[in-house]
Amino acid sequence: MADKNFLTEIIDADLAEGKISEIHTRFPPEPNGYLHIGSAKAIYINWSIANQYGGKFNLRLDDTNPAREGEEYVNSIIEDLHWLGADPNGGIFYGSDYFDKCYEYAEKLILEGKAYVDDLTRDEMREYRGADAGKPSRPSPWRDRTPEENLDLFRRMRAGEFQEGEKTLRAKIDLASPNMNMRDPAIYRIKYAEHHRQGNKWCIYPMYDFAHPIQDAIEGITHSMCSLEFENHRPLYNWVIENIFGTEFPKQREFARLNMTNTVMSKRYLRELVEMGIVDGWDDPRMPTLCGLRRRGYTPTSNFTFVREAGISKSDNLIDMRQLEACIRSELDLTAQRRIAVLDPVKLVVDNYPADKTEFFDVANNPNREANDASTRKVAFTRELWIESEDFAEVPPPKFKRLTIGGEVRLMGAYIVKCESVEKNPDGSIAAIHCSADLETGNGNPADGRKVKGTIHWVSADHAVDAEVRLYDKLFTEANMNAIPEGSDYKDYLNPESVVVRKGCKLEESLKDAKPGEKFQFVRTGFFTPDSKNPGVYNRVVTLRDSFKPAK
């Protein structure tokens, strides 16, 4: 690939000026939740740029906060990258592997008078830094401790002599800086929590803004590409690199996050949806998580196509989720084999067809010419069939072209039938629709040349496979969930029809052996995949068509 954008322009300039000889990127998620479609953008940018320049791409699990991280998330992140095909050719690393180095560099800054141990509480530190609008900053009473005193206190912090919040190590930078991140930021805090890899070895942990540039430098990262909210953190990133390593690289650059309509990307909100039982786990097919999209039937190709079409820029924008749907729809239209499924069945009886007869019609697996698939399959035809209830009307509305009393339709791939009568249940519902078939039309048009306008799909009642079908839709009714009124509850915007469950569906016999991961077009209905958790359940990936036209 040869995508060009403002990030590649920066890299091209660095290469042309001889500042670097190869490109090394990384994706550094915190393992405290599951990756989502927004994460796919960061993965795509770092992985594709490394590939584009013949460089290396690392996965680094940024596990510097022991209170929120765990192996469950680590494993899911590794699985998601593998599924996307973005395997890290530079290796898999953990932020916690660098704790010893971070501690060593913190002592270096202390001895050079560039860091000090502070006794201010978190709230006091916020006040002293002038975090409230319009208030000036002022130095902590402990800012001028000697390097020797700071080193002693820092080592005692590590030894566990103080309570959480009692001491903090801060970088000594510039309290007058207009950038709040440069006003003596905290770089180490006390935290008594067992780490998923380090156990109880540490009770002090480096802050992200301190650990991140150190990790990048140790791994040889040349360009640390992250989302736009870290732009104001770049001066601090550079300060750490310059004061510890004395180099220009790694170089941090930022891009706009991917925001999508009718969903939320906040890990806190997503976790709440899971913990409150509003959704069926992190991999619920309505979730924007990669595992949720995978379970719903989205593919790595469709995800990366969507990210690429959304573009790489420094301006925040809101991408219509229908653009993602258009990507998977275009892919599956070419790759998904066609199958017949009746989601709201009503029985149709062909009275003039022998009750003990079964014949098989050859039906195309994918009639799309661009698919270049000439294969067919055998579909059983018997006297009793299932059709969609909406394909029959006793009192048809205007322009109704499907089955009516006295009217004819083509049974897709089989005979033309004419409705002769309707059999009712005691409650007035339809028990069966009785038809006669023109048995000379199995392989073509009627001999008398009459035209039949409607074609409907069907499944043999004797050969049908019972299934549950779940019709998924957008999770939230509000398009821009980032713009809901302040103070409102995001859960008030949940779509009550985000999933409609159809039980008692009738599927053609060939689907009895379908496996999770396979994709099918249910003719006239949509694209579906077997659910990975529940046998006999099919998830709708996306509808068959939509009026949305993706931007060129």
Located regions from the model:
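A glycine-rich helix N-cap at a beta->alpha junction
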Residues: Y73-D100, Y105-A106, G113-Y116
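Active-site cores that bind ATP or allylic diphosphates and position pyrophosphate for catalysis
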Residues: D63-N65, E71, K108-L270, I328, ...
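Secondary-structure transition/capping motifs at alpha-helix termini
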Residues: A16-K19, S48-K56, H82-N89, A217, ...
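Long, charged, mostly alpha-helical binding arms that flank functional sites
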Residues: P250-C327, E331
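Conserved short loop/turn motifs at secondary-structure junctions
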Residues: P28-N32, R60-R68, G91-D100, D123-E124, ...
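N-terminal catalytic cores of NTP/NDP-binding nucleotidyl/phosphoryl-transfer enzymes
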Residues: D3-D12, A16-E79, H196-S227
